[in-house]
Amino acid sequence: MDENDLKYIEKVLGRKPNHIELAMFENLWSEHCAYRTSKKLLRMFAKTVNEKTSKNIVVGIGDDAAVIRLKNDICLAIAMESHNHPSYIDPYNGAATGVGGIVRDVLSMGAKPIALLDPLRFGDIFGKEGDKVRWLIEGVVKGIGDYGNRIGVPTVGGECEFDSSFDYNNLVNVVCVGLVKENEIITGKAKEPGLSLILIGSTGRDGIGGASFASKDLTEESEEERPSVQVGDAFSEKCLIDAVLEAVKTGKVKAMKDLGAAGLSGASSEMCYGGGVGCELYLENVVLREPLTPYEIMVSESQERMLLAVEPGSEEEIIEIFKKYELPASVIGKTIPEKRIIAKYKGEVVVDLPLDLLCEAPLYDREGKEDLKEKEDDKEKIKMPEDLNAVLLKLLESPNICSKEWIYQQYDHEVQIRTVVKPGKDAAVLRINEVYPMGIALTTDCNSRYCKLNPYVGAVNAVAEAVRNLATVGAEPIAMLDNLNFGNPERPERFWQLAECIKGLADAAEFFEIPVVGGNVSLYNETVIEGKEHPINPTPAIFVLGKVEDVEKVPGVLDNKIKEGDILIITNETKDEMGGSEYYKVIHNTEEGRVPRVDLEKEKKIYEEVREVVKEGLVSEAVDCSRGGLAVALAKMAVLNNIGLEVDLTEYNKNNLRDDILLFSETSGRIILAVRDENKDKVLSKLSSAYIIGKVGGSRLKIKINEKDVVNLDVEEMKKRYYEAFPKMMGEL
C-alpha cells in the first residue's frame, strides 16, 4: 500500500488503523486479493454471459468456484488459480499448496473434486538458467504429483510451455473440477445474522504475508521470503474433503470458504461482505499449532483450513463430523447484522473495521502504451533448409512439442476411474457416471509467444485452440475460466498487454458463445536483475469445459480406433503465418512473421461441423494443428497411434507456399481427421472446408509435395525422438 491508501483509510476510519488492521488492509487491498489494476478491465467479460450462454450457469463470477449445470441436477464446480511466486521460491511446496488451494475452492461449493489440470510455464531449459529450470521442473511436478495423488484426485491434463521469458518467473496455474448435485451447492456468502462460524484445521505461522508477497515483483533477494510460502499436508486435505462432503449432507451448512490468501481475515470478511452481514470473531478459540499473537492468527495462511457458517444449534453435530476425521474444529465467531468485522482476543477488541472499506479497495486507473512486437519476416533471409526430415525430427525433440510423459507419468490420472482420454492428447475426457454416456472434456491453452508479439491476436488464438481441441473429441464448449499471468502493470507496456489480451479473450469467447465464469489474475511476474527488467511473456492461460454427449463415440475409444486404410482429411487451408512459430524459433532463431489470424466466422462453422461428425462416431482419430504446424500434427498422429501415414499435399497447397511454410505454418482452424474409407463421402458432405490429403498405412510418415518426398521418416525413429527428448533434457537418458 502507498501513502495515499493510508491517508484514505485514516480519513474514512477517523483514526489510524492498529497494526493488525493495517496488516488486514495490506493483504485484502493487495493486487492478489483486490484486483485493483484489472477489475475494470475484467468487466469486458460480462458480454460473454447472455440469455443464450447463461442458461446452465448456476453460480457465476464472484464465488470461490463457478458452478455449471451439466444435465438434470448434476453440476460441475470449476476453478482456476495461480501459485506462481511461491513456486519459484519453493517449487515443491509452492506447487503442492497451489493444488490444495484450488481443490478447497471447489470443495467449498459442496462439490467432490474429480479432476485437476496444470498449465505450467518454465524458462529456457537449454539457456543460461537451464540448471535452475530443471530444479524448478522437478520440484513443481513432484509437488503437484505428490499432493494430487495423495488426496485421490486425478491430474488429467494441462500443458507445459518453455520460453526464456520465464527464466526468473515460472508459472504454475492449476484447474480443479468438482461434481455436485444442484440442491447440495453451498456458496461462500453468509446471508443471515446469527449463524455460527466454525474454523476447521489448525493455524500456524506459515504463509504469513502470502497475498502481499504475490503482489510484487520478485527480486534477487526474494529467496529470503521463503517463509511466505505455505506448507501443505495432503493427508489432512484428504480427510478435509471427506469430512466437508459429509457435513454438507446434513443441510446445516449455510456458507463455506477456503482459507486462502489473507487467511482468516480474508475468508471471514469476504464471506460476510458477500452475504450482506458482518461478523464477530473470538480469536482465543482458534486451534493453534504453536503460540500465536492475534496479528498472526488473522493473517496466517496455514493450509487445509475451511470456514463454515452453520445453523445455530448445529455446532456440536458439525464439529463431531470433523472430530471423527481427526480434524481440529471450533466455533470462532458468529455473523452479526452490522456490516463490520470485529475481532476480539480474550475480551479485548483487536479489530473493528467496516467491511465495505476493507473489501472494496480503491481501483487504479493505469495508463497503457502500445508495444506491438509483430513484424514482417524476410523470406530472402530465412532460407528453406535442404533436409526437412531433419527439421521435423528436431521439432519433435523441442521442449514445446516433445512428449511430456515424463511429467504426467508422475501423476495418477486414473484414480476415481472416470478418465476416458488420458494426458497427451488435445483434450482430456472424463465419463460422468451419474449421467452416462454423457461426459466432459477439459482443455487448457495459451501460446505466450503469440501474445508477446500481438496480445489481442494471441488471446483470440488461445480461445480458438481450446474450442478446436474440444472439437477433436466431439465436445461442445459450455464454460471458460481465465488465468491472466502478466508482468508489472505499473509499466504502461505491460498494462497495455493485459488490456489487449482481456479484450481478445472476451471477443473470442463472446463469438464462440462461451460464458467466462471466473478466473484469476497474477501480476508482477517480473524480475529486476542488476537494473534490467525481465517480464514474462503475457500469458492469458484459459481453461474451457466441454460437454460430450456420448463418450463411447470419442475417437480412440472402444472400437473407434484409427487403422490401416483410413482416409486423412484436413479442415481449412494453410497460409503463410509464421510469426511466433515453433519452426522459426527452433530452426531459424527468429520470432518474425505474421501471427496466425483467426477467421471467427469460418472457424466457428468448422468446429461445429467437426463436432457433429465426431459425435456421429464417424471419426477414428482427430488431431489439432497448432505448435509445429501440419507436419508435426501428422507426426504426432503417427507416433501416438503407432502407424504410418501416406500424405500428398500437392492439391491442398492452394496458396503455393514454399514447402517449409506449408509444413510448419501454424494457421488456425485446422484439424486432421482419420475416417473409414466407407465414411469419407458422408464426412466430406458435412464439412464446408475440407480436403483429402492421404491415407493411413505402413510404418513410415511420407509427405509428398509436387511428386517429391519432402518427408519420409520411420515411425519408430519419430517415436524415439518424441518420447526420449524430455528425459534427456532432465538429464535422465
UniProtKB/Swiss-Prot annotation:
Q: What is annotated as the active site?
A: H32, H83 (proton acceptor)
State any GO CC term.
cytoplasm
EC number(s) given by UniProt: 6.3.5.3
Listed SUPFAM superfamilies: PurM C-terminal domain-like, PurM N-terminal domain-like
Positions annotated to bind Mg(2+) 2 = D105, D258
**What are the subcellular locations of this protein?**
Cytoplasm
**Main location (coarse class):** cytoplasm
Where does this protein hold substrate? S82, H83, N84, H85, R104, Q230, E301, S302, Q303, S522
Q: Which Gene3D superfamilies match?
A: PurM-like C-terminal domain, PurM-like, N-terminal domain
Quote the InterPro entries the UniProt record gives.
Answer: PRibForGlyAmidine_synth_PurL, PurL_linker, PurM-like_C_dom, PurM-like_C_sf, PurM-like_N, PurM-like_N_sf
Instruction: Enumerate the PANTHER family for this protein.
Output: PHOSPHORIBOSYLFORMYLGLYCINAMIDINE SYNTHASE SUBUNIT PURL (PTHR43555:SF1)
State the name under which the record lists this protein. Phosphoribosylformylglycinamidine synthase subunit PurL
Native species: Methanocaldococcus jannaschii (strain ATCC 43067 / DSM 2661 / JAL-1 / JCM 10045 / NBRC 100440)
